[in-house]
A protein has these predicted regions:
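Ribosome large-subunit tunnel/peptidyl-transferase-proximal elements
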Residues: 1-134, 138-161, 165-177, 181-193
Length: 193
């Protein structure tokens, strides 16, 4: 992306080398914003990044989306929060002794399947009770819906900006390789420390 040109130090054999000095500067700005935020959601749904997102979010008691961004997660908060509440209710129901629930075996199996499906999409945001103060995004081109919802609601974002990203779509952009799990893990650990 041409808008990333100021963050590129040089190009070698068709590979862009990002300017590490700018990465450090932008990381420090983002870290200050992260420390001020009380309600943070991490977003990264690509298969190689998903486990890193989950681990980092759990380490700092934040929320996360690492399987698929459900459309309207932020912009349709009233409906989504009802789904999350339903997931929590299902969890309580299934924790009870099957004999005391008053459900048949078939109904219990259906409820378990429903819970598994909802857990897959909403498990990382189960404790989210209101819209977040800040959203951390890894893989901007892949997480376009999350980026657009944050923009629509004026929710600040911290984004790892690879050479294929657009810095104009984020509040705090950290130039870094967002394809490498080691790079993502290193940057996010620095951010939350």
């Amino acid at each position: 992306n041409a808008k990333m040109a100021p963050y590129i130090y040089e190009e070698k054999n068709g590979v862009h080398i990002l300017d590490i000095v700018q990465t450090v500067d932008e990381l420090e700005k983002a870290r200050i914003a992260f420390k001020k935020a009380k309600n943070v959601v991490f977003v990264g749904t690509r298969p190689q990044i998903a486990p890193v997102i989950k681990n980092i979010a759990e380490e700092c008691n934040a929320h996360y989306v690492n399987t698929r961004w459900v459309g309207g997660l932020l912009t349709n908060w009233s409906t989504i929060s009802a789904c999350i509440q339903n997931l929590n209710d299902l969890d309580k129901l299934l924790e009870q002794d099957p004999k005391t629930t008053g459900l048949t075996k078939k109904e219990l199996v259906q409820k378990e399947k429903e819970m598994e499906r909802k857990e897959k999409f909403f498990g990382g945001v189960r404790q989210l009770s209101s819209l977040p103060d800040l959203v951390v995004i890894v893989g901007q081109p892949h997480e376009r819906n999350a980026v657009l919802e944050c923009q629509k609601l004026n929710i600040p974002t911290i984004t790892l900006l690879d050479s294929n990203c657009d810095p104009s779509y984020t509040t705090y952009g950290i130039p870094a390789n967002d394809d490498s799990t080691r790079s993502v893990e290193f940057i996010l650990k620095q951010l939350v420390s």
